[in-house]
Amino acid sequence: MIAGLRCLSRCLWTLILFTGHLQASTTRTYYLAAEDVLWDYAPSYPVNPMHGKAFSEDEQIFVEGNKKDRIGHQYYKARYVEYTDASFTRIKPRGLEWEHLGLLGPVIRAEVGDTLKVTLKNKTRDMPVSLHPHGLFYLKNSEGTHYEDGTSGKDKADDAIAPGESHTYTWQVPERSGPGPRDTDSIVWLYHSHVDEVRDTNAGLIGPILISRKGQLARNGKPRGVDKEFVVLFSVFDENESHYLEKNINAFAPEALSQQQDDEFRESNLMHTMNGYVYHNLKGLTMTVGERVRWYQLALGTEVDLHTPHWHGNTLEESGRRVDVLNLLPGTHVTVDMQPDNPGQWMYHCHVNDHIRAGMMANYTVLPQKSR
């Protein structure tokens, strides 16, 4: 009897403490929609910005369509878009600081101890979607993953959101979701659709979650002591494994309907991207000498998505080590800091040779300090 009362007492105190924690935390609300888009991997076509000349014959494999059996540089895809409220009538402007996100969904930001409530509306035409976060704490009704897990009813409502429907996901940000002892004061996680993870992510439904230590977010929304933030996803989007493959073939390469297993056709649909752009088409990576710059690096994909981001001209700090190249595996997240001291326009790319040739390259710009 006494042991039972002690157990009940402990349970009640745990509930009280947990409830108090939730009441004291900040709840951050986001409204995201999954939408069909026509995406351009190379808006500069027919010019390669790397050298200012026409794309070479080898480069054209990935960017030149012929209305017959090559789709080209434009593909129908899906994308997460942020709205201002639950009416989903007004898109929230992204702002110049996030211009570089490209195909990625909006930044979802929180501090340790916060609660995130993210309402997802499916505005695609015929594709079930979801939201699944890496690193955060969630119950079964907010996992956003479609598989047989022994649940039913409301606990399955999050698994697959049908076109025209919506669902609100609730995620907690406990201490174990935030930066570790050797991390920077903010780190990055991924969120993505997980109904059919391979087809969903190749379609484009991916975005970043930025988590800061408790009390580290300044009024401007950035982590304290950080002037610029850049989020970059290195990923080989396999358009052969996208929900939109047949739509893209019908729209841009109708003769390829009978060639979907052709090796050359399949190779042409492997888009080696940084935030959904190839061959130096990624824009917005601009900073000034002396600024404190935080880079959030992500990777997702298959066994070919072994990436080694390399910054020319400047170095970075990773967990106390000085580096200019990182290692990324599919599904991993790395956060590093840079304080550039070398002005100029510098190459920033994956150092895997095959990926370089296929266009996984960009530039970042370091402006000189203004003289006083």
Task: Give each language-model segment a name.
Residues A24-R372:
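Copper-binding active sites and cupredoxin-like electron-transfer domains
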Residues S9-G20:
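Bacterial N-terminal signal peptides
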Residues M1-C7:
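N-terminal secretory signal peptides that target proteins for export/translocation
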